[in-house]
From Swiss-Prot:
Pfam families: AAA_23, SbcC_Walker_B. It comes from Staphylococcus aureus (strain NCTC 8325 / PS 47). GO terms for molecular function: ATP binding; ATP hydrolysis activity; DNA exonuclease activity; endonuclease activity. GO terms for cellular component: DNA repair complex. Belongs to the SMC family. SbcC subfamily. The gene is sbcC. SUPFAM superfamilies: P-loop containing nucleoside triphosphate hydrolases, Rad50 coiled-coil Zn hook. CDD domains: ABC_sbcCD. This is Nuclease SbcCD subunit C. Keywords: ATP-binding, Coiled coil, DNA damage, DNA recombination, DNA repair, DNA replication, Endonuclease, Exonuclease, Hydrolase, Nuclease, Nucleotide-binding, SOS response. Heterodimer of SbcC and SbcD. InterPro entries: P-loop_NTPase (IPR027417), Rad50/SbcC_AAA (IPR038729), SbcCD_Nuclease_C (IPR053380). SbcCD cleaves DNA hairpin structures. These structures can inhibit DNA replication and are intermediates in certain DNA recombination reactions. The complex acts as a 3'->5' double strand exonuclease that can open hairpins. It also has a 5' single-strand endonuclease activity. Is probably part of the SOS regulon and involved in DNA recombination and repair. ATP binds at residues 34-41. The keyword DNA damage applies.
Length: 1009
């Protein structure tokens, strides 16, 4: 990620400020300088806040970023443009605030844009989703951004001096190693669940085994005494247990079947005796009821005589009733005939009146026919009357337009001829322009090659001079080194080792006496005097140390010079002097000017010709359009004339209005005549139809009357014949019989009921006599006692069998469940063994006591340290190397860092370093961390880094080394920005971003020293 432009509004001390990072050429190193509190670190805060909504340091909250001098109605916002993977993005973040005069907070806003074809297009417009978009785009979150892009004040050396637990948190964030801890937790939970399931399965097996029914059987009890943990023994005993249970069930079933058969015998015997007893009682009762029924026989015979007489008189009564109905019909027919005759007379009168109206209408027939003829002939004109009326209105306008269009067309033709004369034989020559452009490009390339070669030669001479100077220094230092090594070899180092043993020799002398045996060599001690000059030895040792220190310093200088020569050689190898033209710059510039003038002249000529051609095409198009309009005008004018002629010929009118008035009047008269004529015809037809209907009705009524009279005569004859057959003389006899008809239904029901009961008694008595014949009735009480005894015994055995059967089936189900649990348990133990082992390994139960996450973090830390040591060796003059401490720290292994001093060949705690040495180590470690994260993250583009930390703790030489390290970062294509108050940096770094403060707000500007 490379910053391009930063705009701040009401952010920290910046009320309205813009910083253009595009002024930084070729990713050069630049310094951010200013007084304390001017807002230098706020620039880093602004970039971090724009991307992630957080400051560059964790201690600063979002509310602390808003300027105290900001307008209460204006929001705090940051707009940040940056380049990533050759694509340009812009983010605009507005912080939440309570607007002056409001009580509710205005929410935060965040927009993400991407430049496409020179314009910004929005990608996200919500705070949460936009921030997530930036995290996915950059490949880092805010914490990782602080470690990789911005090394903030106070946090620069945090990673170096932190303990293992703190480093674990930092590395976990940078390398996303929480997934390995999550794997450990998942495996731990999985093992916990599996162990719980296994224990639960053992408990289920034990519970099922304890619930198996023994039936108080010694064999089963013996089988159940096996412990449930002995699952193999359980598998052996289960078939034996099931077999013994089946034997017990079979024995109980046999007793049950015997009891059921005995009960069925006594049950059948009891049922048959009860049925016989009921049949005898029923037979006696039916015989008594049958005798009582026979006593009603005389009454039933009288009822049957009355019913027979009622049946015989039925026909006579029907004839009498029919006579009354026929007489009523005859009277109604006579009334209908009279009404119909009156209706026919009224219809004849109405027809005579309508005939008079029809005759008067026919007298106007000739006049109507002439109007119909006119309407038919001119109907087509009236239907399109607007067309003809418009023709009268348009004809004069079209004549005027035609004349005007003709004049305009002639003017355009004359203009076209003038343009064609101007063009003449001239033609556009674009090939010549291409040829001139190519020539100019080639000349520019030759000029650039000459300039680049001159610049490269100057740079080469400078580098060769630097290389020669470095080689001379190396030769001089090599000569001095050889002299020092020769001087060092002259010392006898074997005689200098006693200096370290001075206290040891003194202790031995104090513990022995003359004449004792020496504890070192075993000889007799002759003298305890001083035989060793320790002062002389110490002096020579100091001289040797001084020589060795000088040798080491010279070797370091030689190594540095060799490194510088290597760097110079790389620059020399990168210098490329190209083949250049034989012409001088003056000649090439003159040729360039001539070709550029020729190119401009040809472009002007082409432009003039194209303008003339464009004007010609425009005039041609106008002529064509005018001709089309003129043709259209003539066509419309001819059409108007034809329509007017057609109208006047057919209508004999020369005025549209008069024609319309007469036509509508004729149509109205014809319609009125036709409607009235149709109305009269409809009335005549209706009268004719109504008269025909009434005539048919009259004939129908007369025929009905004749039929009714004939029916009445026949009915009278039938009445006389029936009275003669029944020996009835007058109507009084008939009335008496008719009085019985009200009781007929009751009499018939009484007779039918008697006959039905009589028949039922006969059938039932015969049936019961057949069922009780030759059968003996037993003692019911004895049978009942025996029945209850057998039933109780049977029920007891059925219940016992049901219980035993249920318990046997339950035992089978439980043993099957036990077998299933055992099989599943064995398979589960087999399958989960590897998971148990894996869980122990990743949880730290291994030979190194390392969890999986710590193992991964140690791998990354080793890579970071290796990368950091490449720079630390240069910055510390090959004295210090960072190493990882192997000892356990606070329960975490190997995440703390020590420093190894090559001068003393010993490792020591990082806190023993001076302020400058700590800065060197922190810078090397931070840069190593940055590079390793970039390698591992796959896609993070680290094209810039900003450092806000103490260069003031460094001496002059160390400061130079640190600057060289940062300059090397520039050569890798990374922009490097530094915040510092060190005045030496202002002299060494040519580009400075100066931050000035006027007490309440700050401003920035780039300047060069």
């Amino acid at each position: 990620m490379k910053p391009l432009h930063l705009k701040l509004n009401n952010f920290g001390p910046f009320l309205k400020e813009e910083i253009d990072f595009s002024k930084i050429d070729n990713n050069e190193l630049f310094l951010i300088s200013g007084k304390t509190g001017s807002g230098k670190t706020m620039i880093f805060d602004a970039m971090t806040y724009a991307l992630f909504g957080k400051a560059s340091t964790e201690q600063r909250e979002e509310n602390d970023l808003r300027s105290h001098f900001a307008d209460g109605k204006q929001p705090m916002s940051v707009t940040f443009e940056f380049q990533l993977n050759h694509r340009i993005y812009k983010v605009h973040r507005q912080g939440p605030y309570i607007k002056e005069g409001n009580t509710t907070k205005t929410n935060a806003k965040f927009d993400v844009f991407e430049m496409v074809d020179g314009k910004y297009e929005i990608r996200e417009s919500k705070v949460i989703s936009g921030t997530q978009f930036i995290i996915e785009l950059l490949g880092v979150n805010a914490d990782q951004f602080r470690q990789l892009f911005i090394l903030p004040q106070g946090e620069f050396k945090r990673f170096l001096i932190s303990n293992s637990r703190e480093k674990q948190g930092i590395l976990r964030t940078l390398f996303d190693s929480e997934k390995f801890e999550a794997i450990r937790e998942i495996l731990k939970e999985e093992v916990k669940k599996e162990k719980a399931q296994i224990e639960n399965r053992y408990q289920q097996i034990d519970l099922l085994w304890q619930e198996i029914e023994s039936f108080d059987d010694d064999n089963i009890k013996g089988l159940l005494e096996v412990a449930t943990q002995q699952i193999d023994k359980l598998i052996e005993n289960i078939p034996l247990l099931q077999a013994r249970s089946k034997e017990i069930l079979a024995s109980v079933n046999e007793s049950k079947e015997t009891a059921i058969k005995e009960f069925e015998i006594i049950e059948k015997k009891t049922l048959e005796n009860n049925i016989l007893k009921d049949n005898i009682n029923q037979l006696n009762k039916n015989k008594i009821d049958f005798v009582q029924l026979n006593e009603q026989q005389p009454e039933i015979e009288g009822i049957e005589a009355k019913l027979k007489l009622l049946q015989d008189i039925t026909n006579l009564l029907n004839y009498i009733e029919n006579r009354e109905k026929i007489e009523t019909k005859i009277a109604n027919s006579k009334k209908d005939i009279s009404k119909t005759n009156n209706k026919i007379l009224n219809l004849d009168c109405d027809k005579r009146n309508i005939d008079k109206e029809k005759k008067m209408l026919e007298e106007n027939g000739d006049l109507i026919e002439s109007k119909i003829s006119f309407i038919d002939k001119t109907r087509v004109l009236f239907n399109d009357i607007n067309k003809y009326q418009q023709s009268y209105l348009n004809i004069e306008r079209l004549r005027t337009e035609g004349e005007q269009l003709g004049d305009e067309l002639n003017d355009l033709i004359k203009g076209l001829e003038t343009v064609e004369d101007s063009i003449g034989n001239n033609q556009s020559d674009y090939e010549k322009i291409i040829e001139l452009n190519n020539t100019i490009t080639n000349i520019n390339n030759e000029i650039n090659i000459i300039k680049e070669n001159e610049k490269a030669k100057a740079e080469l001479d400078k580098l060769l001079g630097s290389k020669q100077e470095l080689e001379n220094q190396i030769n001089e230092e090599t000569s001095i080194l050889k002299n020092l090594e020769i001087k060092l070899d002259r010392y006898d180092k074997t005689k200098l080792d006693l200096n370290d043993k001075e206290s040891f020799i003194s202790e031995i002398k104090s513990a022995v006496n003359i004449g004792d045996q020496c504890p070192i060599c075993g000889n007799e001690i002759q003298d305890l005097g001083h035989h060793i000059d320790f002062d002389s030895i110490a002096k020579r040792q100091n001289e040797i140390k001084e020589i060795e220190a000088n040798i080491h310093a010279i070797k370091s200088n030689i190594a540095v010079h060799n490194s510088e020569i290597k760097f110079v050689n790389e620059k020399i190898s990168n210098i490329n002097i190209k083949t250049q033209s034989d012409f001088s710059l003056e000649v090439l510039n003159k040729r360039l000017l001539e070709n550029e003038n020729a190119l401009n002249n040809q472009r002007d000529l082409n432009k003039f010709i194209e303008q003339m051609k464009e004007e010609k095409d425009n005039l041609t198009l106008q002529i064509h359009n005018k001709q089309l309009r003129l043709n259209k005008n003539e066509s419309e004018l001819k059409l108007c004339r034809d329509l007017i002629t057609e109208f006047e010929t057919l209508s004999k009118y020369n005025n549209i209005t008069n024609f319309e008035v007469d036509y509508k009047k004729y149509v109205q008269d014809v319609n009125q005549h036709q409607e009235l004529s149709k109305e009269i015809e409809d009335k005549l037809m209706q009268l004719s139809q109504r008269k025909l209907i009434e005539q048919n009705n009259l004939n129908h009524y007369e025929n009905q009357l004749e039929t009714y009279n004939n029916d009445l005569e026949l009915n009278e004859q039938s009445i006389e014949m029936e009275m003669s057959r029944l020996n009835l003389t007058d109507d009084n006899d008939i009335d008496e019989i008719i009085a019985w008809r009200g009781e007929q239904e009751e009499l018939e029901q009484k007779r039918d009921t008697y006959k039905k009961r009589y028949h039922e008694f006969e059938m039932e008595i015969a049936r019961l006599e057949s069922l009780t014949k030759d059968k003996e009735l037993l003692d019911s009480d004895k049978l009942k006692d025996e029945y209850e005894l057998k039933k109780g015994k049977m029920n007891t055995l059925i219940d016992e069998y049901s219980a035993v059967h249920y318990q046997c089936q339950n035992n089978i189900n439980k043993t099957q469940s036990i077998v299933s649990h055992i099989n599943y348990l064995n398979q589960e133990l087999k399958d989960q063994q590897e998971i148990f082992q894996l869980a122990e390994i990743v949880s730290g139960k291994n030979n190194k006591n390392l969890t999986l996450e710590n193992f991964v973090l140690i791998y990354y830390l080793d890579q970071i340290i290796a990368q950091a040591n490449l720079r630390l060796a240069t910055m510390s003059d090959n004295r210090y190397q960072l190493i990882r401490r192997e000892a356990v720290s606070h329960g975490l292994s190997g995440l703390e860092i020590d420093v190894f001093d090559l001068h003393s060949n010993k490792s020591r705690h990082i806190s023993s370093l001076s302020g400058g040495e700590t800065f060197q180590s922190s810078l090397a470690l931070a840069l190593g961390l940055s590079e390793i994260v970039q390698q591992q993250s796959g896609g993070i583009s680290l094209t810039s880094i900003f450092i806000d930390e103490g260069f003031g703790t460094l001496d002059q030489e160390t400061l130079e080394t640190a600057l060289d390290t940062l300059l090397n970062l520039k050569s890798t294509g990374r922009m490097v920005g530094i915040i510092s108050h060190v005045s030496e940096l202002k002299n060494r770094i040519p580009l400075v971003l100066e931050v000035k403060s006027d007490q309440y707000q700050s401003s920035t500007r780039f300047k060069r020293n």
